[in-house]
Design a protein with these regions (language model features):
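Aromatic-flanked redox-active Cys/Sec active sites in thiol-based oxidoreductases
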Residues: 8-12
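FMN-binding flavodoxin-like domain, especially the glycine-rich phosphate-binding loop
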Residues: 2-3, 14-17, 25-29, 34-36, ...
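Short acidic active-site motifs
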Residues: 40-45
Length: 147
């Protein structure tokens, strides 16, 4: 059975909701899913998964959230060849660097040798119906790439 690992950072609950939507779709598609908050796991846990997903918010003027910086740095040192990855997240279009943390994780994953399974999904603040559709399509694309 395909295993997806989702690691998230969430301050307001918006990004955790994003992670849960993706996880629910994975389960609907018959994928085993582990969902964990970024401070409770190690980046090396992605080595056990077929699909690796990070869900993060962007803090302030484009910074990674403090709580996910160590995870990000550890991820950069991994060899994830043969893995499929995807990145989703929330931000605020009020800022010039909308969802920059999503872009940062996208580049970080690419440097690990993992294969990008879907375009990143960026949500403005909280999840709307159109975002749910994009997040579910994101999950479907990752599963299709992994199988």
């Amino acid at each position: 059975m395909t295993l997806a690992k989702i690691v998230f950072a969430s301050m307001t609950g918006n990004t955790e909701e994003i992670a849960d939507i993706v996880a629910d779709k994975f389960r609907d598609l018959g994928v085993e899913v582990d969902v964990d908050e970024c401070t409770t796991v190690d980046a090396e846990d992605f080595l056990e998964a077929d699909i690796a997903v990070v869900a993060t918010y962007t803090y302030g003027d484009g910074e990674l959230p403090d709580e996910i910086v160590d995870f990000y740095e550890d991820l950069a040192g991994l060899d994830l060849n043969g893995k499929i990855y995807g990145v989703v997240g929330s931000g605020d279009t009020f800022y010039d660097e909308f969802c920059k943390a999503v872009d940062d994780f996208d580049r970080c994953f690419a440097a690990t040798g993992a294969e990008k399974g879907s375009e990143c999904v960026k949500v403005d603040l909280s999840v709307e119906d159109e975002d749910i559709e994009k997040l579910e399509a994101f999950a479907e694309e990752l599963v299709a790439k992994a199988n």
